[in-house]
């Protein structure tokens, strides 16, 4: 009687003829993922070429929507004003120099502070920037937490606090509406996503991809309106974006709101000229001003806000460039 645990003779003959071979362990490292991480990583360096020994627990990683290379300095800057403000503030606090290229070009094998291009979905509230400190004892600071910390540092100066608040409400709202409604989807995605929209539609697959990309852009726009309490200040705008049908009445109201925001922003920008004087290193208000100006002038399409800044606020543009030079080699 054959036991249920015995090996059938035909199978036994095969394994006797072709014995099992032990293979070496295979690495589980995904090279494609590693290269993508390097492509999205930008390393800060110490001012003056210093090289203090950093451990993994002593480093931070700043998550942003996307980056651009600034034309005059070659610095890799965040494309969003809030992200760029935190980037500049971290450089000033830690004595760092802005990155100029990704790790894809020059991989780093040492522990350094980094800026990473991330999806908004990397944060539960779908907003960036986020700041990750340490590795094993990891501390993750959300956009709201970062904003509260930065704001707390100027509470003692009423005038700076007033302008800081105006920038993060009036000018911020104008920036968001101009990028969402006045720029193309391709321009918007270039600023707030590492995905690029395809401009050519040839095959049915291209049509399908184009529709998916438009849905992705709309989803990202809606999530952006939830940052900095924008949705509470402009309920009608957000409501019209979430609706299936966008009627003429909503379009007229939206245009009126955009015009009011733009006019108010013009007054704020023109009033900043008296706040540009500095004794020594830039203040947090100066970094905030420079962040908005650099991001506005980076927009490739001629939105009204960019045109006004370049034509009527040349002093602010020069101030932003001078501020940026504090953080380049």
Curated annotation (Swiss-Prot):
Protein name: Sorting assembly machinery 35 kDa subunit
Assigned GO CC terms: mitochondrial outer membrane; mitochondrion; SAM complex
Keywords: Membrane, Mitochondrion, Mitochondrion outer membrane, Protein transport, Transport
Classification lineage: Eukaryota, Fungi, Dikarya, Ascomycota, Saccharomycotina
Additional detail: Present with 1470 molecules/cell in log phase SD medium.
UniProt entry tagged with the keyword Ion transport: no
Principal location class: mitochondrion
Signal is among the record's keywords: no
Subunit structure: Component of the mitochondrial outer membrane sorting assembly machinery (SAM or TOB) complex, which at least consists of SAM35, SAM37 and SAM50.
GO BP terms in the entry: mitochondrial outer membrane translocase complex assembly; protein import into mitochondrial matrix; protein insertion into mitochondrial outer membrane
InterPro entries assigned to the protein according to its UniProt record, in alphabetical order: SAM35
Cellular compartment(s): Mitochondrion outer membrane
Source organism, top-level taxon: Eukaryota
UniProt xrefs under Pfam families: SAM35
Function of the protein: Essential component of the mitochondrial outer membrane sorting assembly machinery (SAM or TOB) complex, which is required for the sorting of proteins with complicated topology, such as beta-barrel proteins, to the mitochondrial outer membrane after import by the TOM complex.
């Amino acid at each position: 009687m054959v036991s249920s645990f015995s090996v059938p003779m035909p199978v036994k003959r095969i394994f006797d003829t072709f014995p099992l071979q032990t293979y070496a362990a295979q690495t589980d490292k995904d090279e494609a993922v590693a290269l993508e991480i390097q492509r999205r990583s930008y390393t800060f360096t110490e001012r003056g070429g210093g090289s203090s020994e950093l451990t993994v627990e002593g480093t931070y990683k700043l998550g942003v929507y996307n980056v651009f290379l600034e034309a005059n300095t070659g610095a890799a800057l965040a494309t969003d004003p809030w992200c760029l403000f935190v980037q500049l503030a971290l450089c000033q606090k830690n004595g760092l120099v802005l990155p100029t290229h990704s790790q894809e070009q020059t991989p780093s094998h040492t522990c350094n502070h980094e800026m990473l291009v991330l999806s908004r979905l990397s944060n539960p509230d779908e907003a960036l920037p986020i700041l990750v400190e340490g590795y094993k004892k990891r501390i993750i600071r959300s956009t709201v937490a970062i904003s509260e910390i930065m704001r707390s540092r100027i509470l003692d100066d009423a005038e700076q606090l007033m302008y800081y608040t105006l920038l993060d409400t009036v000018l911020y709202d104008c920036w968001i509406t101009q990028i969402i409604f006045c720029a193309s989807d391709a321009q918007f995605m270039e600023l707030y996503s590492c995905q690029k929209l395809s401009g050519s539609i040839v095959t049915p697959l291209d049509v399908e991809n184009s529709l998916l990309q438009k849905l992705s852009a709309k989803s990202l726009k809606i999530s952006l309106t939830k940052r900095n309490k924008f949705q509470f200040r402009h309920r009608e705008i957000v409501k019209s974006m979430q609706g299936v049908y966008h009627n003429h009445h909503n379009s007229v109201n939206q245009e009126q709101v955009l015009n009011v925001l733009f006019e108010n922003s013009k007054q704020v920008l023109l009033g900043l000229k008296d706040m540009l004087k500095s004794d020594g290193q830039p203040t947090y208000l100066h970094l905030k001003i420079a962040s908005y100006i650099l991001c506005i002038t980076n927009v490739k399409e001629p939105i009204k806000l960019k045109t006004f800044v370049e034509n009527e606020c040349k002093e602010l543009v020069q101030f932003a460039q001078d501020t940026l030079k504090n953080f380049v080699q």
